[in-house]
Amino acid sequence: MTSHAPDPVHQFEVSRLINISIGNMDLSFTNVSFFIVATVVVSSVFLFISSSSRGLVPTRMQSVSEMAYEFVASTLRESSGVQGMQFFPLVFSLFTFILVANFIGLFPYFYTITSQIMITFSLAMLVIFTVISYGFYKHGVGFLKLFVPSGVPVLILPLVTMIEVISFFSRPISLSLRLFANMLAGHITLKVFSGFIVSMIGIGIMGVGGSILPLIMTVAITALEFLVAFLQAYVFTVLTCMYLNDAVHPGH
């Protein structure tokens, strides 16, 4: 018998857990929905427990939550100044949600919701919508200064303005694709190496010896994926703070 390696893309399929339909609308509760809820619950419980008992000697959980708090707060202050701190709840929630979602997806048989482009695109659109809404609310038409750089010769100003507009509205695409592609590629690579190990072991004693290198690679890639999971949350947060600065200081 020939054994077929598991499909590495199968882990990203969306499956219905509870069928819900209203008219022609499919509102089914899927595995993606479940892990979105799980991510929110895990994040909330962790932050509640870590912040409920504040001692002079912080626990490990308290230290982690304080490090996350200081990271987001310092990044916002450096990017947008003191005025940017009003966005702290949004940025901290995004950072925590993405980080926990990435880590949850690393456990076997768990779903990585950040490997779904619609999830990452929704998060990116939330950021851009906040920038546009606050920009017009705070500065009115003056927010459009963002698309008109100072010091540009009048002759090429229309071209530069068009480039700035395209660059601004491409931000949610690049922001979402970066997170989506990194999580997707990493999990596919893990699945391929894991499937190769199983296939080699199925061959027999010779296959067991041949599976040692893929096993080492799988362990190394898993460790790397934990680093990538943090880095992607970090990058998303830093870019979010930079974009929010455009809403606070559109003329800079």
From Swiss-Prot:
What the entry lists under Pfam families is as follows: ATP-synt_A (PF00119)
Q: Quaternary structure?
A: F-type ATPases have 2 components, CF(1) - the catalytic core - and CF(0) - the membrane proton channel. CF(1) has five subunits: alpha(3), beta(3), gamma(1), delta(1), epsilon(1). CF(0) has three main subunits: a(1), b(2) and c(9-12). The alpha and beta chains form an alternating ring which encloses part of the gamma chain. CF(1) is attached to CF(0) by a central stalk formed by the gamma and epsilon chains, while a peripheral stalk is formed by the delta and b chains.
What gene is it encoded by? atpB
Under what name is this protein listed?
ATP synthase subunit a
| Record's keyword annotation contains Iron-sulfur | no
Q: Which GO terms describe its cellular component?
A: plasma membrane; proton-transporting ATP synthase complex
CDD domains membership: ATP-synt_Fo_a_6 (cd00310)
Q: How is the protein disposed in the membrane?
A: Multi-pass membrane protein
Q: Family, per the entry?
A: Belongs to the ATPase A chain family.
Determine if Transmembrane helix is one of this entry's keywords.
yes
Q: What are the alphabetically sorted keywords of the record?
A: ATP synthesis, Cell inner membrane, Cell membrane, CF(0), Hydrogen ion transport, Ion transport, Membrane, Transmembrane, Transmembrane helix, Transport
The molecular function terms of the Gene Ontology recorded here are: proton-transporting ATP synthase activity, rotational mechanism
